[in-house]
Amino acid sequence: MTPRRCLIAAGGTGGHMFPARAAAEALIARGWQVRLVTDARGLRHATDFPAVAVDEIHAASPSTKNPLKLARAALELTQGFAQARSIVGKWKPDVIAGFGGYPAFPALAVARSMGIAFAIHEQNAVLGRVNRVFAAKAGFVASGFERLDRLPAKAKKRHILTGNPLRAPILAARDAGYPAIDADGRLNILVLGGSLGARILSETVPQALAMVPEKLRSRLDVVQQTREESLPMARETYQAAGIAAQCEPFFEDVGSLYAASHLVIGRAGASTVSEVAGVGRPAIFCPLAIAADDHQSANVDGLVQAVACDVVHEGEFTAQKIAALIETRLSNPDDLASRAQSARALGRPDAADALARAVDGLVTGALV
């Protein structure tokens, strides 16, 4: 029997590519062949992507008022459409699955124009611009969170909650459980700033931890994703405060870092929020203020309602406020453990399998 084929189209950031990778692995486990189309940025996240082929296509965002940039974006997307049409014509996928981002636009446009079954997965709690264009005609709209704003009325009957597919190391951290906190034992803090590290976290969190009372400060072990230009200052701040800290722009083994952590501090991107819930960790989130449709604030809605996290918006994210909040949380291990349990209850470790089942069902007519 010839394996079914799924063409995955995903944008060029880790937020789009990591769920696409996990979904690809689940589809392959079900006997599918997978092929990926993305742009030049996406290729940075496509090393060892589980696919029979990885294709680079042209793509650009038309979200600009500059006429020259708008014309260039239109040209890039037109070229991308031609490239995607050629790939689809030769490979003949059974399904095209879009994971958001403008590199997904050409492939989804080809699917719609050629009558090929297609589906979309939205990582955030607000439907993104590209997914919004295709949602009404998609075979299904899968979402990472129960909340999904900006979903067209025509697509609501085909909305399914799968969760955001998580990488295997993250799922392994879930199995590790929440680490016990012994009296006077070490307290592990993990600070994540998205794929490039957030400036406000890189600069404010070290200052905040340096203000924590010495009795707690002496117990801290900090692992922080830090912007390259902020590394010297962050390291100097931690060293002056006597805090054991490891600061790097990127960490390869994030799963083990999650497993060891007692508290996570980070942005509220879909991947980070889903990982925090998937592993089951209390967290302090600082949503990106300029995120489209304020989707990062929407992403944490479920965890907020479950009393599993704190949310501090950028305008209030000062060293003094964060220091006081961290002191409050770390001084109450029972509350931390309770928050971890509440977060874990919202995790969806089977998200990749659920999405793969939905793709299967789209082809067989048994969508569940």
Swiss-Prot record:
Role noted for this protein: Cell wall formation. Catalyzes the transfer of a GlcNAc subunit on undecaprenyl-pyrophosphoryl-MurNAc-pentapeptide (lipid intermediate I) to form undecaprenyl-pyrophosphoryl-MurNAc-(pentapeptide)GlcNAc (lipid intermediate II).
Top enzyme category: transferase
Entry-linked SUPFAM superfamilies: UDP-Glycosyltransferase/glycogen phosphorylase
One GO biological process term: regulation of cell shape
Alphabetical keyword list: Cell cycle, Cell division, Cell inner membrane, Cell membrane, Cell shape, Cell wall biogenesis/degradation, Glycosyltransferase, Membrane, Peptidoglycan synthesis, Transferase
Binding residues annotated for UDP-N-acetyl-alpha-D-glucosamine, in chain numbering: T13, G14, G15, N124, R167, S195, Q296
Name of the gene: murG
Protein name from the UniProt record: UDP-N-acetylglucosamine--N-acetylmuramyl-(pentapeptide) pyrophosphoryl-undecaprenol N-acetylglucosamine transferase
Pfam family, one: Glyco_transf_28
Pathway linked to the protein: Cell wall biogenesis; peptidoglycan biosynthesis
EC number, UniProt record: 2.4.1.227
